[in-house]
Amino acid sequence: ANQTYFNFQRFEETN
């Protein structure tokens, strides 16, 4: 999996 994409998804969930 793409770590950058995963981190982006995490950011979207927290924002």
From Swiss-Prot:
Keyword field contains Glycoprotein: yes
Glycan attachment residues as annotated in the record: 2
Molecular function terms, GO-annotated: carbohydrate binding
Induction (UniProt): Hemagglutinating activity is inhibited by polygalacturonic acid.
Keywords carried by this UniProt record: Glycoprotein, Hemagglutinin, Lectin
Origin superkingdom: Eukaryota
Quaternary structure (record): Heterodimer of a 29 kDa and a 31 kDa subunit.
Function of the molecule: Trypsin-stable lectin with hemagglutinating activity. Has mitogenic activity on murine splenocytes. Inhibits HIV-reverse transcriptase.
Family stated for the protein in its record: Belongs to the leguminous lectin family.
Name of this protein: Lectin 31 kDa subunit
Species in which this protein is naturally found: Vigna unguiculata subsp. sesquipedalis (Yard-Long bean)
Taxonomic classification: Eukaryota, Viridiplantae, Streptophyta, Embryophyta, Tracheophyta
